[in-house]
Amino acid sequence: MDSILVKGNGELRGQIPIAGAKNACLALMPATLLSDEPLTLTNAPRLSDIRTMTQLLQSLGAEVASLQGGQVLALSSHALTDHRADYDIVRKMRASILVLGPMLARDGHAVVSLPGGCAIGARPVDLHLKALEAMGAELDLRDGYIHAKAPAGGLKGARVVFPLVSVGATENALMAATLAKGTTVLENAAREPEIVDLARCLRRMGAQIEGEGSSIMTIQGVDRLGGATHPVVTDRIELGTYMLAPAICGGEVELLGGRIELVGAFCEKLDAAGISVEETERGLRVARRNGRVKAVDVMTEPFPGFPTDLQAQMMALLCTAEGTSVLEERIFENRFMHAPELIRMGARIEVHGGTATVTGVEKLRGAPVMATDLRASVSLILAGLAAEGETIVSRVYHLDRGYERVEEKLSACGAQIRRIPG
């Protein structure tokens, strides 16, 4: 397996282009299953998770062509040959569950393996299933698979109240509702930009949707959806990750394609820590103000709060902050697996349940460390950029699931980083 070698060497300066959002693209791709007309996605990220979703859709009989070096995806589901999403593919990625709603809505039946993905707590799919049951679906869980069948005449509009905010469940219910008979109201729906992006794409395909970006969405089902061309929204998690690079190392970096509204709560914490964020004509410019970074407290929340997917990277910044910071993880359990690796680099971190207390040190030290999940992997790279000596991050296949060309983007700004083939 590949690893990444990082040498801490001072300030970063330059520009980093931000890719299309992985989490948005992974929801947009299954939307092709709702229509027999082509769907074209532009600004697509080039990631292993996208390739996994491509394999899954192709296994169902969909056509997926990667164009312009992978930045354009041309999809068509005019002739599905199968409605069974097998474990061998689904186990690789949790977003695979998003084929369930579209297949059920369009063709009335689907068999989907229970999903896999990052090892971050339980992350159950029960909210997805309850939403589909509210629309009349008959579900049977056996042998590790979800066997789903729509009632005669198809899914029916319903009032769906999510007991917890769930991005994936909102996406599955939203797609299913576009072809359901009647009106569906989603209450306590997720508000993330990726939800808004999916709704806009579905509307381009002919769906009737109101309220995206709020906690209540209303969908009037239609008889059929058509084709569309849609640009994938900017990846706010990649944006936030690279904003932390000059924050940790010093210097000044412009993030091309970045927008404040995608990372508002995150920017507030950066400002409190002593990091300057300015809008430019092409994106965002980030620089550390004079002196050492200041400690801040962070609590992860659903959008528009501080994103859980930036918690690990923020911890890397706070490891060398002046003072003590408290990070409270309120979205996923077991999401501090990067903390022991940062401790190997000299960080002072104490974890008690869903809370981590970080007491800043003057300097981290390079060390061999192991990535445990996607966001943990990049947090260790960020820590390595500011550490004395060499840091070798192993198991970076996690990294390739969510970041494209990370070593190229950072080295273009002066970082000493390279991939070591495994």
From Swiss-Prot:
Q: What is its EC number?
A: 2.5.1.7
Binding site residues for UDP-N-acetyl-alpha-D-glucosamine: R94, R123, P124, V125, D126, L127, D309, I331
**Where is it predominantly found?**
cytoplasm
GO CC terms in record = cytoplasm
The annotated pathway is:
Cell wall biogenesis; peptidoglycan biosynthesis
| Keyword hit for Transcription | no
Domain of life of the source = Bacteria
**What top-tier enzyme class does this entry carry?**
transferase
Keyword Nucleotidyltransferase among UniProt keywords: no
Q: Which reaction does it catalyse?
A: phosphoenolpyruvate + UDP-N-acetyl-alpha-D-glucosamine = UDP-N-acetyl-3-O-(1-carboxyvinyl)-alpha-D-glucosamine + phosphate
Gene3D superfamilies listed in its UniProt record: Enolpyruvate transferase domain
Tell me which InterPro entries the record gives.
Answer: Enolpyruvate_Tfrase_dom, Enolpyruvate_Tfrase_sf, MurA_subfamily, RNA3'P_cycl/enolpyr_Trfase_a/b, UDP_GlcNAc_COvinyl_MurA
Q: Which residues carry this modification: 2-(S-cysteinyl)pyruvic acid O-phosphothioketal?
A: C118
Residue positions annotated to bind phosphoenolpyruvate are K22, N23
Instruction: Give the residues annotated as active site.
Output: C118
UniProt family annotation: Belongs to the EPSP synthase family. MurA subfamily.
What is known about what this protein does? Cell wall formation. Adds enolpyruvyl to UDP-N-acetylglucosamine.
Q: What is this protein called?
A: UDP-N-acetylglucosamine 1-carboxyvinyltransferase
